[in-house]
Each structure stands twice: as C-alpha cells, then as structure tokens.
Amino acid sequence: MKMWFRLATFVTLIIEFAHCQLGAGLTSALTGNTGNAAHAGNSGNMATSMAMAAAMGSDFAALGPLGAKLFSGAGMSPAVAYKMFDGSVADFQKYKAKMNLMKRLNAGGSGGIAGGGGGGATGGLGALAMGKLALFTGGGMDPVVAYKMFDGSVSDFQKYKMKKKLAAAAGAGGGMGIGTLAMMDGSMADMAKFNMLSKVLSPPTGSQTGAAANGTSAGAAVRGGSSPLRRIANMRMTRKLCEDTPVVYRMRRCSPQLPCRHALTTCKQTLRYGSVCCAKNLYAAAMFENMPGF
C-alpha cells in the first residue's frame, strides 16, 4: 500500500511540475494534440516550441528562435525534450544551468546561426540549431545527441571548454566523430585519455603510408585519416561493427577474404568462425574502454 501511495504521489508531482513549469504548450504536446511527434514538420515543431519557450519564462523566451530550435526546430519535439527532465527536485536547477549554458554559447549574436561559424562559441550553438555542431569540425551531430551531452551539472561549461580544446587540437580538417565525443565525460581524466590515445594512434610514418596500397597491417593505420581524433572514433566504431555483431554477420563481414578492418590494422588470423582482429588491437581497445568514464 505504501508503495502505491508513493508512486501516486510521485506521478502527481511530475504532473504538477509539468503544468507549472512548462505551461499549456507542453501539456498539449505531451497529449498529442499539437501533432508534434518526432517526425512532425519543423514549422509545427517551431510554433509549439516557441509557445513552450514563452511558458518557460523570460530566460528561455529571450533566446527566441534559436532557443526553440534547440528543442524542436531540428527534429526534437517538446515531448522528447521534456523527457530529459526526470521530475526530480533538481530539475529546476538543471533548467537554469542549461539556460545559462545556452546564453554563454549564444553570446556572440546571430552570426553563428547564419554561417554555422560566428565568433568562438556562437558557431557551436548556431550550428547545433541547424543540425550540426561547428564546434566539432566535420563531425556532424544530431541536435538531440548534442543536447543530451549536457546534463545540467556544474561541470557542463567545463565539458564544453574541454571539448572545444579537443576539437581545436584535431585541426580544421580533422573532424571529430560521435564515437569520439561519447568518450568524453567531462572528467579530469579526459585530457589524459586523449593524450594516451593520440600516442597509440600516432600519425602514420612514410613506410606505413606506402604500405596502404598493399593492404598490409601497417597500411591500414592510415584508413582513418591523419587526425588522432578521427582514428580514435574509427577504432571504436570498427571494433563495435566487427566484434559486437552476431556470429552469422561476423562470418560474412570478417571472413578471410574480408578481414576485420580495425582502425589500427587489418588482421588475417583465421579462426573457427572466420577472421578476427589482432590481439594487439583488441588489447589496445580494451585497455581504453575499461578506463573509468570511458
């Protein structure tokens, strides 16, 4: 009985929170009356989210179309945005932290929206609203994924600054994939992880570059491009593809004719179910994936 009473109380609190904080705009979105599903047109999303922005208070409304686009203009419905809040007492603090973060990112005006570049941080949020993060050069990112990176904690702005530094380290044409961004959790260990991974995935030598044409192990190191960040992302993505798939698929994908293409090397060690990646690479990947926060 106590459990049901607590559950009913919790649900009531969530409903009251939604009603008070987000207003009628969100309530109608949650009940489906606005037609604002995840795949609804941007114009419908925009209208509803602007109403939601006004209901959420002057902080959010002051951001205008940019603030609304962060939630729905590029594919995020108000209902989905609301689900990011769990109904806890900390929700209002999360809301304030996110508003402050958006204000900092938007400090340079509208230049970032138009060009995806702007000045400094502006390009990051401007491009976010348009469907990509200019902050992370070349590594197109879904707005929902980008928004979820920030959890409303005090460390959000530190995460932003660290990721900006890492993106700069990758170089203008380096690119940063979603796989790489997922590695970064905002902890103090992030820079150490980056430095260590960069050493392991050091730029290929002349001999390695030449070997690429022959499809040798050394030559495969250059498949991911010259950027350490891109190679890190490729390492994780390829490992996932080749090692975490069902055996039937793995046999086709990683046969002796189509060896498992790891970002570090190409292996031709044939086992019972086909080809697998070299032990050296498996060790390297496991070493980093087992690090705290990785």
Swiss-Prot record:
Its main location: secreted. Residues 205-225 are annotated as: Disordered. Nacreous layer of shell (at protein level). Expressed primarily in the mantle with highest level in the mantle pallium and lower level in the mantle edge. The keyword Secreted applies. Residues 205-221 have a biased composition (Low complexity). One of its GO terms (cellular component) is extracellular region. The keyword ATP-binding does not apply. It is found in: Secreted. This is Glycine-rich protein 2.
